[in-house]
Amino acid sequence: MEYSWLENKLQEINRKCIQINNKKSNNDSLNMIIGKLIDVMKDTSVLFKTLYERIIFNGSYYNNLKISKADEYDLDLILVLPVALETVLMLTPEAGYVDVKIDISKIKKLAYYRDILTPLEKLCENGIFSSLKIHSWFEGLVQKSLNIINASKYFPQYKLDMYKSGPAVTLTVHTPFSSYDMDLVPCLKLDKSLYPKGYKKQNCNHIYAVSKPNKDKEWRLSFIEQELSILRDNGHVKPAIRLLKFLRDQRDHKLIKSYFIVTVAMWDLETTNFNGKSLSFAFMTLLESLYKHICERKIPFYWNPNLNLLNKCHRDYLFNLENQLLNILKKLRSSNSNPNVLNEVFNFDIQES
């Protein structure tokens, strides 16, 4: 079915309702503060200095999928284990998670690693590099480094606070005019030779594993670079994802995480060519696919379809969501080509300019 009559209205919603308040001052202060924090963390911990490689700016803002002002930033601090440790990934019973096994005995006689041997051993449990222990170590290191920065008054114009938030250590920056959060997450970079069996392979040099504070030793696999590559240069897919996120928020369905919608889009990209197609085509394709997945009670994890992203959503919630999405699709299909139906769909009144 053709939905070109929705095009102008969707473009207007995308332009007016999903604006990112991209303040250059936020970006400038963020780069300055995180740069100093990394320097102090290196000075404070020889282990961090040895393992740290770089920052990957992740999340909706940097992937151009954010639908609100730029006051939250996701930063993955990439750590690389020495090759000499002969790292091995072991799949766990929970899909999407791995144990990271290392052999510390391999570096005991290497002078270069003498200073990190003891702190590295403290982060291991029976030869497993513990996600829980490294998260606790990372949290303490950030707090200690932040205390040094605040005591030294490096940034007298800002107030810096830290608190825990899920898998991240969150740093709040209070400026004279606003505030924003930086979510810092320790993340292992792993060679592609460690790619686990049963996972879909994509052209890449690395995979990543993210520390989870609610796990004992396990790490969650992450495919940051691969997902960026999949979503890049694919017509109006990203604007359509933003519209679906906006629809989700307007309908108060926060249990449908942004990553669920991104995953639906990645599956659609395997079977649909979005290049040269309209925003209305991309939006309706993703909306109909989301509805289909909700009806099936399954959004397969893109990298391992054995994992269902909806497995923690209550069946009553999914039943209600299914009915809501069906009603939305019915309204769009029976609206006699009236684009103002989107005001009702999005619970938002917007006039075309």
From Swiss-Prot:
Its EC number is 2.7.7.86. Mn(2+) binds at residues 269-270. Keywords: ATP-binding, GTP-binding, Immunity, Innate immunity, Magnesium, Manganese, Metal-binding, Nucleotide-binding, Nucleotidyltransferase, RNA-binding, Transferase. The keyword GTP-binding applies. One of its GO terms (molecular function) is 2',3'-cyclic GMP-AMP synthase activity. It comes from the Eukaryota. Belongs to the mab-21 family. Mg(2+) binds at residues 72, 74, 183. This is Cyclic GMP-AMP synthase-like receptor. The keyword Transferase applies. Nucleotidyltransferase that catalyzes the formation of cyclic GMP-AMP (2',3'-cGAMP) from ATP and GTP and plays a key role in innate immunity. Acts as a key sensor of double-stranded RNA (dsRNA), the presence of dsRNA in the cytoplasm being a danger signal that triggers the immune responses. Directly binds dsRNA, activating the nucleotidyltransferase activity, leading to synthesis of 2',3'-cGAMP, a second messenger that binds to and activates Sting, thereby triggering the immune response via activation of the NF-kappa-B transcription factor. Its cofactor is Mg(2+); Mn(2+). GTP binds at residue 183. It comes from Nicrophorus vespilloides. It catalyses: GTP + ATP = 2',3'-cGAMP + 2 diphosphate; GTP + ATP = pppGp(2'-5')A + diphosphate; pppGp(2'-5')A = 2',3'-cGAMP + diphosphate. The lineage of its organism: Eukaryota, Metazoa, Ecdysozoa, Arthropoda, Hexapoda. GO terms for biological process: innate immune response. ATP binds at residues 60, 72-74, 245.
